[in-house]
C-alpha cells in the first residue's frame, strides 16, 4: 500500500450548521469521528487543519494532531497547501483531503484514492466517482458529474448533465439510457505535495468560476486528475441539521448492534 498523509480541513463557520465540527455524534465531536475513520485508513499521519481554537482543543483532547490555519483561505485546497508547508512534507508525498463533515467515510476508500494516485505517475490529483442511475440526479445542478477518458483521467466536471444523450434526451428525460457512462463525483481528493505547493499560484479559471468547482482550475492549467470508480455511492456527509440527525441515527444503530 502506498504511504500517504491525511489532512482534515475543519472550518468552524457554517451557514447552515454553525459550529459543525463540534456537533455531537454519539458522545464525540464530529471532527473526532472523522479523525477516527481516517486513522483506520493506515495513513502515516492524520492532521486536522482548523481556523478555530475550540476545534483545535477538541482534536488534541482526543489525542489527535491539529494545526491552526488562516481564516481567509478561499478553498480547502489552499488550506492544505498551508499545512504541507508547515509540516515540511516532501514534494512526492501523497496527501488525502478528507472533509471534516464526513463522519461515515469508509477508511478503505481513503486508502484506495491514495493508491490510485500512487499508481498513476502522470496525475497530480486522484479522486473518486460512482455510477449514477437516477435521471433526477443527472439533471440536478447540486450533483457534480464527471466524464473521463480511456485512461480514467477526468475530461471535465460539471453541474450540467454530462455526457448528453442527444437522441434519447430529445424525446424524454425520465430515465438514463442504458450504457450512458454517467458518473457522480465524490468529493474526496488525493494530491501530490508538489502540486499543492504550486496550486495557489495558478490563476482561477473562468470555468471554475462559472461552475463553482475548484477542481476545474487544475484541468484548465493542464494537470491530470485520475478518477477511481467505485461501485456504490459512499455515505453522504453533513451539510444540514437533517443530515446531522441522519448520521446520529446511523451511529446509534451501529452502537446498538456492536
UniProtKB/Swiss-Prot annotation:
Paired cysteines (S-S): none
EC class name: transferase
Record-level GO cellular component terms: cytosol
Any one GO molecular-function label of the UniProt entry: 3-deoxy-manno-octulosonate cytidylyltransferase activity
A Pfam family it matches: CTP_transf_3
Metabolic or biological pathway: Nucleotide-sugar biosynthesis; CMP-3-deoxy-D-manno-octulosonate biosynthesis; CMP-3-deoxy-D-manno-octulosonate from 3-deoxy-D-manno-octulosonate and CTP: step 1/1; Bacterial outer membrane biogenesis; lipopolysaccharide biosynthesis
A GO BP annotation: CMP-keto-3-deoxy-D-manno-octulosonic acid biosynthetic process
Similarity comment: family membership: Belongs to the KdsB family.
Protein name: 3-deoxy-manno-octulosonate cytidylyltransferase
Native organism: Aromatoleum aromaticum (strain DSM 19018 / LMG 30748 / EbN1) (Azoarcus sp. (strain EbN1))
